[in-house]
Amino acid sequence: MLRAWAAILVVASVLLGCGSDDPESRPADAAQLKGAPPPIAALHRQGNELLDGGPEAFEQRLRELKGYPVVVNKWASWCPPCRAEFPYFQNQAAKRAKKVAFIGVDSNDNDDDAREFLAEYPVPYPSYKDPSLEVAAVFKGQLAFPTTAFYDSKGELAYVKQGGYRDEADLVADIERYAR
């Protein structure tokens, strides 16, 4: 009987996420997000959600964010390089929550797998559903997984990186270079 209770406690701890004190594995907390300007705060309110609307809704969101730099990350739950770099985006979105807008684009994926992925890697910004790469075409990101696009504060597409980031320092360098 004691073994059964021990097994139940272990399973409960895993399901509740207990035991991980690694700050890199935790989503942004409210204190990090508090004080963001209204257009970026609107993204935070939709954090970790999958949004419909296609390229029209995505382009409207970009227009709403004019005046702020924007980082767009195209990903898919089945993409190993996307999984490898996603913690970098989690971390940078939290660190830059008041100055840089982040948006995800979930391409060529199904909703259940995407939601499972976001449950594993929660982010303080939404992702637009893009089953046919129409949203990715807005930022010329149809070819590679992952792809990251950088918009400057004027709303101009400044740079598109095809392929994944090997380390967070490279992402930081691109954010500082292009998302201004």
Language model regions located:
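N-terminal targeting signals for export/organelle localization
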Residues: 1-52, 173, 180
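Short pre-active-site segment immediately N-terminal to redox-active cysteine/selenocysteine motifs
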Residues: 68-70, 75-78
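Hydrophobic beta-strand anchors of alpha/beta hydrolase catalytic cores
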Residues: 71-72, 102, 148
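Structural microenvironment flanking redox-active thiols in thiol-disulfide oxidoreductases
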Residues: 83-121, 131-138
